[in-house]
Amino acid sequence: MHLKTFSNLLVFVATVAAHGYVDNVTVNGILYTGYQPNSDPYYATPPPRIIRPVQGNGPITDLTLIDLQCGGYTEGGIVGSQPANLTAGPVAAGSTVSLRWTLWPDSHSGPVITYMAKCPAAGCSTYVPGTAAVWFKIQATGRIGNTTVWGDTPLKTAGNSYSYTIPSCLSAGSYIVRHEILALHAAWTYPGVQFYPSCHQIQVTGSGTSTGPSSKVAIPGVYKATDPGIVYDMYAVQPYTIPGPAVFTC
């Protein structure tokens, strides 16, 4: 069997088998259960959640959809960035936040990228960024050299866990944190790359004064179909360029 054909078969099997979403988030020692797509929509009164609703464990494959922002499914009634009814924290700038994903398939290798966007003074519970350029990247891990180790490898080897650090210089306030995995197992053409975004809301404290970089990005809009990190053959031995802006540092 030809290698590419065999790869296609593996992709199909993996696609049928499983994907994933962020199941819970630990902020300042408190574990917050995330949005549960298989049960939360059926409650008369929605449970308190810090994670914005997602359509399930499936991917977003169209870079132009608002669903790319936070994993919604607009056609199915879940808008691209429907606010959560709870905000985690308070948590000090400079702290580390831990996320736990559901089961993640071995075949779905790719980078892990985290963005933040500051909410208005009224908080995040009614804030919908839309197509405004409000997002900045705070973390990104791609392919380690030309190895088979990727940003999402810890999800397969460390109990489906991942963490990020809130920039220590950020000003106090409420933020949306957008955490995503790009699965590249079918990304040798576009459409092909699979996006698994998840957004949660946190209240940050501290004496920092930064609001992130002066130039921010819109989501959707940050990625283009022609970007090197969007179209990529992960089965080839070659470097990988993480798409999007540079990581913000204090």
Curated annotation (Swiss-Prot):
BP GO terms, sorted: cellulose catabolic process
Residues carrying covalently attached carbohydrate according to the record: N24, N85, N146
Cited InterPro entries: AA9, AA9_LPMO
Disulfide bonding pattern of the chain: C70-C199, C169-C250
Catalytic activities: [(1->4)-beta-D-glucosyl]n+m + reduced acceptor + O2 = 4-dehydro-beta-D-glucosyl-[(1->4)-beta-D-glucosyl]n-1 + [(1->4)-beta-D-glucosyl]m + acceptor + H2O
Induction notes from the record: Expression is increased 8-fold in cellulose-inducible conditions (in Avicel- and wheat bran-containing complex medium).
Assigned GO CC terms: extracellular region
Pfam families: AA9
EC nos: 1.14.99.56
Main subcellular localisation: secreted
Keywords: Carbohydrate metabolism, Cellulose degradation, Copper, Disulfide bond, Glycoprotein, Metal-binding, Monooxygenase, Oxidoreductase, Polysaccharide degradation, Secreted, Signal
Cofactors that this protein relies on: Cu(2+)
Biotechnology: Lignocellulose is the most abundant polymeric composite on Earth and is a recalcitrant but promising renewable substrate for industrial biotechnology applications. Together with cellobiose dehydrogenases (CDHs) an enzymatic system capable of oxidative cellulose cleavage is formed, which increases the efficiency of cellulases and put LPMOs at focus of biofuel research.
Cofactor detail note: Binds 1 copper ion per subunit.
Amino-acid positions noted as binding O2 in the UniProt annotation, renumbered to this chain: H185, Q194
Single annotated GO MF: metal ion binding
Entry binding sites for Cu(2+): H19, H108, Y196
Localisation: Secreted
Signal sequence annotation: 1-18
General function of this protein: Lytic polysaccharide monooxygenase (LPMO) that depolymerizes crystalline and amorphous polysaccharides via the oxidation of scissile alpha- or beta-(1-4)-glycosidic bonds, yielding C1 and C4 oxidation products. Catalysis by LPMOs requires the reduction of the active-site copper from Cu(II) to Cu(I) by a reducing agent and H(2)O(2) or O(2) as a cosubstrate.
Family: Belongs to the polysaccharide monooxygenase AA9 family.
Official protein name in the record: AA9 family lytic polysaccharide monooxygenase F
Species in which this protein is naturally found: Botryotinia fuckeliana (strain B05.10)
Gene assigned in the entry: AA9F
